[in-house]
């Protein structure tokens, strides 16, 4: 009698565990397919007094999630000159660009907007980008807004 009692419980546990495995795998597969592969770069703009290090956590998480494998950095000097670090292969999809302003405490947002334009011109000349996405924090939002105003 005791032996017959355990079989249904064991069967129930196996079914629940098997169902959980199937559902979790399905959710994982769906999560990896929730993005679109494009050639459009996403620029990350840091906040006041910050640097590319603040952006690295986000870009590394995106790479770890499998959305892209391509991250470069655009460093803007105090005179507005842009230097690209790293390179994007032609096959790159969903490329990420960490934008770093060396003058990271410049409160002249109009100037920062011009410097962002310099970054975009450099990216366009180097890679032919015509569109971009942006993720910005604090001063980065104002920089983006002033770029769009000019």
Question: Where are the language model's segments positioned?
Answer:
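Soluble periplasmic/extracytoplasmic beta-strand elements of cell-envelope proteins
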Residues: 44, 96-100, 133-135
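Active-site catalytic motif of lipid deacylating hydrolases and related acyltransferases
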Residues: 49-129
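N-terminal Sec-pathway targeting helices
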Residues: 1-15
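A short, charged/proline- and glycine-enriched loop
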Residues: 36-40, 92-95
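Gly/Ala-rich beta-loop-alpha elbow adjacent to hydrolase catalytic centers
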Residues: 135-140, 144
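Membrane-interface motif at the C-terminal end of an N-terminal transmembrane signal
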Residues: 16-32
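Short beta-strand element of the alpha/beta-hydrolase
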Residues: 39-47
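Primarily recognizes the serine-hydrolase "nucleophile elbow" in alpha/beta-hydrolase
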Residues: 148-150
């Amino acid at each position: 009698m005791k032996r017959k009692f355990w079989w249904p419980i064991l069967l129930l546990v196996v079914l629940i565990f098997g169902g959980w495995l199937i559902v979790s795998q399905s959710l994982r597969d769906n999560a990896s397919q929730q993005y679109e592969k494009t050639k459009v770069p996403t620029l990350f703009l840091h906040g006041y007094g910050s640097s590319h290090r603040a952006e690295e956590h986000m870009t590394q998480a995106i790479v770890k999630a499998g959305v892209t494998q391509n991250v470069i950095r655009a460093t803007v000097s105090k005179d507005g000159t842009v230097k690209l670090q790293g390179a994007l292969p032609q096959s790159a999809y969903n490329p990420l660009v960490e934008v770093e302003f060396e003058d990271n405490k410049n409160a002249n947002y109009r100037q920062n907007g011009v410097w962002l334009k310099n970054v975009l011109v450099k990216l366009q000349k180097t890679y032919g980008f015509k569109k971009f996405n942006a993720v910005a924090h604090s001063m980065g939002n104002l920089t983006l807004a002033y770029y769009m105003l000019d």
